[in-house]
Amino acid sequence: KRLLGESGIAVNQVIPEGGYLNYLKDLPRAWFNIVPYREVGLMTAIFSEKEYGMPYISITPMGISNTANFIAQIEKLVNMWASALSEKRLNYKFYVDNQTKFV
């Protein structure tokens, strides 16, 4: 959640953290799903992609390379929506460079 917040991305829901059955109706509002651990949630993400056309990212953001790849996938999906909504495209290169500069 911290990484997404620093990237300017609002989180719709984190399941099952603090989840209620009533909140499930809001799941299709998300632009994409994140499955940081393939053992948990991958089947739901695949279902959401088939049912709602909602893409997902299944990269675990651990380590420099995977985190940079994770952010690149987010950038790609956010910019896909930005193009559809005629909004400004994002570039997270500076963020990735800044986060990995001293490692």
Curated annotation (Swiss-Prot):
<dbReference type="GO" id="GO:0046872">
    <property type="term" value="F:metal ion binding"/>
</dbReference>
<dbReference type="GO" id="GO:0015979">
    <property type="term" value="P:photosynthesis"/>
</dbReference>
<comment type="pathway">
    <text>Porphyrin-containing compound metabolism; chlorophyll biosynthesis (light-independent).</text>
</comment>
<dbReference type="GO" id="GO:0036068">
    <property type="term" value="P:light-independent chlorophyll biosynthetic process"/>
</dbReference>
<keyword id="KW-0149">Chlorophyll biosynthesis</keyword>
<dbReference type="InterPro" id="IPR050152">
    <property type="entry name" value="ChlB/BchB/BchZ"/>
</dbReference>
<keyword id="KW-0602">Photosynthesis</keyword>
<protein>
    <recommendedName>
        <fullName>Light-independent protochlorophyllide reductase subunit B</fullName>
        <ecNumber>1.3.7.7</ecNumber>
    </recommendedName>
</protein>
<keyword id="KW-0067">ATP-binding</keyword>
<keyword id="KW-0411">Iron-sulfur</keyword>
<dbReference type="InterPro" id="IPR000510">
    <property type="entry name" value="Nase/OxRdtase_comp1"/>
</dbReference>
<keyword id="KW-0934">Plastid</keyword>
<keyword id="KW-0560">Oxidoreductase</keyword>
<dbReference type="Pfam" id="PF00148">
    <property type="entry name" value="Oxidored_nitro"/>
</dbReference>
<dbReference type="GO" id="GO:0016491">
    <property type="term" value="F:oxidoreductase activity"/>
</dbReference>
<dbReference type="GO" id="GO:0005524">
    <property type="term" value="F:ATP binding"/>
</dbReference>
<keyword id="KW-0150">Chloroplast</keyword>
<comment type="similarity">
    <text>Belongs to the ChlB/BchB/BchZ family.</text>
</comment>
<comment type="subunit">
    <text>Protochlorophyllide reductase is composed of three subunits; ChlL, ChlN and ChlB. Forms a heterotetramer of two ChlB and two ChlN subunits.</text>
</comment>
<dbReference type="GO" id="GO:0009507">
    <property type="term" value="C:chloroplast"/>
</dbReference>
<keyword id="KW-0408">Iron</keyword>
<keyword id="KW-0547">Nucleotide-binding</keyword>
<comment type="function">
    <text>Component of the dark-operative protochlorophyllide reductase (DPOR) that uses Mg-ATP and reduced ferredoxin to reduce ring D of protochlorophyllide (Pchlide) to form chlorophyllide a (Chlide). This reaction is light-independent. The NB-protein (ChlN-ChlB) is the catalytic component of the complex.</text>
</comment>
<dbReference type="GO" id="GO:0051539">
    <property type="term" value="F:4 iron, 4 sulfur cluster binding"/>
</dbReference>
<keyword id="KW-0004">4Fe-4S</keyword>
<keyword id="KW-0479">Metal-binding</keyword>
